[in-house]
């Protein structure tokens, strides 16, 4: 009985968190120069990931290997570009608590970001679509939070990721 109560409490807290979809703060992005807009010339979504997390970097490598048509671009949360995109998405620029998928019009966080990324990859589209329809967001986010909060204990840290020369166009400039 105690475990069910703990699970219900965890689900209630997860449901009370901010929504997984955040509309872009147009006022903040308007204040920036047009040259700083990563969507000015390329409207492909941008995945913001923890640049020092081994597990996160392994996952980025897997996505790169399974996205041959370059539907997604990447920026480390800790990079200047990542910090600007976090602000544009209504998040604090030093918030590295969640993966973020940023599109020209909205941003997705936590499990919703993972599922939206999965829908971009032909290999995982069916699974992501089914999971999004079947698994309640509160449960998916609770599972995401458990992994995210323990990611350094699970896989450790590495030095800040440098983009591969062959894939430079897939990573947002570190200007």
Please name every model-derived segment.
Residues 43-44, 71, 95-96:
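A structure-centric signal for secondary-structure junctions around beta-strands
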Residues 80-175:
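Thiol/selenol-based redox catalytic cores and closely related redox-interacting motifs
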Residues 37-67:
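Local sequence-structure signature of Cys/Sec-based thiol-disulfide redox active-site neighborhoods
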């Amino acid at each position: 009985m105690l475990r069910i109560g703990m699970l219900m409490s965890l689900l209630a807290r997860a449901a009370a968190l901010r929504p997984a979809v955040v509309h872009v703060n147009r006022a903040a992005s308007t204040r920036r120069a047009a040259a700083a807009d990563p969507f000015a010339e390329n409207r492909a979504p941008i995945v913001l990931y923890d640049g020092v997390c081994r597990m996160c970097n392994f996952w980025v490598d897997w996505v790169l290997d399974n996205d041959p048509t370059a539907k997604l671009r990447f920026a480390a949360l800790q990079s200047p570009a990542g910090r600007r995109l976090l602000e544009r998405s209504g998040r604090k620029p030093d918030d590295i608590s969640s993966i973020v998928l940023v599109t020209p019009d909205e941003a997705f966080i936590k499990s919703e970001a993972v599922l939206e990324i999965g829908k971009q990859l032909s290999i995982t589209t069916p699974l992501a679509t089914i999971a999004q329809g079947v698994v309640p967001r509160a449960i998916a986010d609770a599972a995401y939070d458990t992994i995210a909060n323990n990611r350094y204990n699970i896989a450790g840290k590495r030095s800040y990721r440098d983009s591969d020369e062959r894939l430079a166009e897939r990573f947002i400039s570190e200007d």
